[in-house]
Amino acid sequence: MHNLADIIAATNLYNCGDYFQAELICTKIIDTQLDNSDALCLLGRIKYQLSKNQIASTTDAGLRYHLWYYNNQIWNTTTWAGVKALKSPCDMWNYQEIIWDLKPSLILEFGSFFGGGTLFFASLLEKINNKSQVFSVDIDHTSLNPQVRNHPRIELMLSSSTAPQVSQRIVELRREFPGPIFAILDSNHEKQHVLGEMQLLRPLLQTGDYVVVEDSNINGHPVLPGWGEGPYEAMEEYFAIYPDDYQRDDLREQKFGFTFATAGFLIRR
């Protein structure tokens, strides 16, 4: 009965346009009752309205597209060679241009998931560098496509991306595949984890190496306001400690009008 009264109160707030208070009530209900269909349904309607209002409030074409593309989860349908990639095609095109120019011998990917991105990077390496490898790290490989598991240019590690064995293996791979590194951070998006990834890479990278910090668009940069501190805030803290480590590649970030890697295209100094 308590939840029913809360649902009625949240619905009344929603109908009055007070979406934030309605969202707060629904979230509290779901925290204690994950399968409450009324709260889940109303929360979906609230998020749709918030997204719609956010898009309507801006005249920036790139921002409008970013919000539409992200909030409608079009990114969740993107694939490479039939394998889910979960990325922005604009970012992927940017990556291939960066990789073609950089010609890395080693690509580091923190966060494999289905493996579409992993396969994409391996496909690029086949075109540009005879002696090269993708090293992809994730805590769970159960969703990986067989194409990824069996690819000769892909090495997988089942581990947290901040674990010491990851650093040790990168040192070994750097000896085996000398040359530039392209690294992409796309695993756990919580601030402290991303900060740990950046700190792990700090002694391993050389001048000219390239790092992309993905999903720094969350927590209101510009999507998912209120998500909590994530990659963007991790970069802010990192640069407060090490202000001279990287140069931001603003031209790349701005090239297509929007990116999932807000402020996250970085060249090692």
PLM segments and residue spans:
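TPR/TPR-like alpha-solenoid repeats
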Residues: N12, I46-L50
